[in-house]
Amino acid sequence: MSLPGLSTAQRFRAVAPRTPSWAYVALYSVASLDVFASDAYRSIGGGGQASARFTEAIRRRRNVYAGIERVPEVTDAGCVVLCDDMRHTWHLADCLFVPLKAAAGRRQAGATELDGEPSRRALAVIAAETVDRLNLMVTEGLAVYTPITKRYVSP
């Protein structure tokens, strides 16, 4: 995969069977919203060959959040924890949530529609061992994801 403006990409699957948000999540680091309006993005169909391998995972709901310039790598020993309900204040040992804010709201970005919801969320990358120890898989308001691909890093 090569797309100007995209620096990292990694796909994840929810750990809990009844995850409150999405069964699958893909996290990308992009330079700006202009990536989604580029000819290069349109030429790969906004998903490319990697998306063809994950057709069951793709519903084409996209959001762009500001708050992390470059999404960190998540190894097989790690998890991504998302919180879509920012009314909670999470104080968990060994877990630091980074607050994110929708960067665009609802709008068209080239061939891609961004829905802008939720307008705020938080993300943490933590050890799977910590997820188990704190029983985060069944903690209301949190969704836990494990990697299903290695992290792509643009050359």
PLM regions: where:
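Macromolecular interaction modules
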Residues: S2-P155
